[in-house]
Amino acid sequence: MYQVWGWWAMLSFVQIFNLKYAVREYMKAQKFNHLTSARYALLYTSVCAFRTFLPRQDVSKICVFNTPLSSVFIGRSLATWAEIAFIKQLYLFNNSVLKTRLSYNIVYAIYIAEVFSWLGTLTENQIFNTSEEITWTATIFYILYKNVVTAIFSKKYMPQKVRKFLYLSILFKFLYIIAMVKIDIPNYLNNWQTNTTTFSLQDGFYRSISYRNVSTNYEDWKIHIGWMTPYFTIAVWYSILMARYQSYSVL
């Protein structure tokens, strides 16, 4: 129990600073022509903060606080908007700042991933969650490939700070793919094979609104702490940095 409360307190403290910096980048963005990226970052950061303050698990419906705001329906709805904002920010940043020409199909791919996520959340059949993670992994792999090509052939045309951020982006995406292939996707596949209880879309919809299983048991949260921590910290910082470096698109 104490491990979960300690994790929650630490991560909540970090979110206060994340919100501060996201708002600051949004205010600074008004001086340049890159408000869109800053809006995406602020939305993504705000939703991650909300999900930190009221942590919950979509499929199992486990949450820390027994409040209507902890409903999976609310949390998953906000997460959907945030993740779409994140992929749109990635598309904008790569095309305008890193000069990595990405297809807009990556956004459509994440729309599909969000459908998989909702199907997994409502039916609790984790083959859908597995499909979501595979879609995200394939999308990020495509962006990584394009970033590497840019780093090899176009880096000399970039400002030094942008070039360094490109290298950071490559590292970030590489580590993400490793984590997905080694940890997340196998976990969801294992859950799919061991969990035989599923629900109809209608029953799952009602459960997502009203059913909450309150727990601060570390065993219930151990795996989720492993992915929530980098999701609500590193990914948020990356989004805020994209908003900051978006000013290079007007140079």
At which residue positions do the language-model features occur?
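C-terminal transmembrane-bundle signature of multipass membrane proteins
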Residues: 12-20, 146-251
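Short helix-loop boundary/capping segments
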Residues: 112-169
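Short aromatic-rich membrane-water interface segments that cap or initiate transmembrane helices
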Residues: 1, 66-81, 216-223
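Transmembrane alpha-helix entry/boundary detector in multi-pass membrane proteins
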Residues: 72-79, 103-107, 127-140
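Hydrophobic transmembrane alpha-helical segments in integral membrane proteins
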Residues: 1-17
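Helix-loop junctions on the outward
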Residues: 46-74
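Internal transmembrane alpha-helix with an interfacial aromatic "cap," most often the third helix
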Residues: 16-26, 52-59, 76-124, 147-154
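Membrane-interfacial loop-to-transmembrane alpha-helix junctions, especially the N-terminal start
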Residues: 29-43, 99-110, 159-168
